[in-house]
Amino acid sequence: MHIGLIGGIGPAATEFYYRGLVNAYAAAERVMDLTIVHSDARQLVKNLSAGDQAAQAQVFLPLVERLQAAGADAVAVTSMGGHFCVTALEAVSPLPVLNVIPTLERYFAGKGIKRVGLLGTRTVMETRVYGGIPAVDCVLPEGPDLDRVHDDYVNMATAASVTDAQRDTFFRVGRDLHARGAEAVMLSGTDLFLAFEGQDCGFPVIDAAEVHIEAIFRWSLGAAEL
């Protein structure tokens, strides 16, 4: 199957998806068929902040059409934040959308996980992953920590690099979520790997992007549902 990715939102997340898929195919000794198109991260942040799902879906639509013209069989958005408009995108997309949200729901059910902490954008956290994992009790950052996590995440994703202060925020808040009963903390923002990769944060972590990448890989081999 030919995979189509909408990237650029942010650039580091795109590279993370690409590297993950390359490694998965190499381990399976298979040849990957992949096309990536670029979307603007600042435009996404603007529409996400405004809650304008229709506008962002219309931004993504010509990119999906470009992927279709390139031969892609389905499309995936390489951003948890970008999934805020996934329902609107599915309604207009000429290609099937490899939606991370039902993938996460199946993942948690399969692992028997009932309570998770969330780190990511304000929208992802406040909507509890867009209401897509109702069987899971989501633990959110409290008080000013929610705004701090959102701001640090957006700044990190836009810059495609993490500062020590930003990493300290994510680790401190993550420890608090774990102390408040979260079985694990889900990295609900794709670029959070910049802060967590290769680090000992002191609490269990589930990377939503890694779950999505594995599902995309399995779908492309015909081994998983959309």
Place the predicted regions along the sequence by residue.
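Non-catalytic structural scaffold of enzyme domains
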Residues: M1-L226
